[in-house]
Regions:
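Short, low-complexity cationic-aromatic patches
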Residues: 1-2, 10, 14, 54-63, ...
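Vicinal oxygen chelate
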Residues: 3-6, 10, 31-34, 79-122
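Mid-chain, well-packed structural core segment of small domains
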Residues: 64-83
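Conserved short beta-strand elements that form part of the metal-binding/catalytic scaffold
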Residues: 28-63, 108, 112-117
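Short, well-ordered beta-strand micro-motif
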Residues: 43-45, 71, 104
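Core segments of cupin and vicinal oxygen chelate
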Residues: 2, 9-49, 96
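A generic structural signal for ordered secondary structure
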Residues: 46-47, 53-55, 69, 85, ...
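Short beta-strand micro-motifs in enzyme catalytic cores
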Residues: 40-42, 66, 101-103
Length: 122
């Protein structure tokens, strides 16, 4: 079976402006959640389909951008396989609270993508 897109995330330099724009453009339910260590993460609930979130961009000098998360059974093995195929690891495998495990890569063309293993898999 294929690896579905599980989550999309907006890393923005202006959360307030992004919230205003997307809440008017789409019928999304936006819910703020406190993040460990401070700050706010906004969950995006879309009803049917892949949901997501938005947060302040953590990479100084990087333009606002969307990040796609692809579901994998084993994030460590998939990260290693991607690296063997020429990807660069931007964010190494890390736990995300009680939700799951992730990594962020750039493919051989320079495009960023995140791998996501839901908690309870493997």
């Amino acid at each position: 079976m294929g690896n579905p897109f599980m989550h999309v995330e907006l890393h923005t330099n202006d959360v307030k402006r992004a919230r205003e724009f997307y809440s008017k453009l789409f019928d999304w339910k936006l819910q703020d959640m406190p993040m460990p260590g401070g700050g706010t993460y906004t969950m995006i609930e879309v009803g049917t389909g892949t949901g997501g979130g938005m947060a302040i961009n953590q990479a100084p000098g990087t333009p606002s951008h969307w990040m796609a998360y692809v579901g994998v059974e084993d994030v460590r093995a998939s990260t290693k396989k991607a690296k063997d195929l020429g990807a660069k690891v931007v964010v190494d495998v890390m736990e995300v609270g009680d939700y799951g495990t992730m990594s962020v890569l750039t493919d051989p063309t320079g495009a960023a993508i995140a791998l996501w293993q839901q908690k309870g898999h493997k």
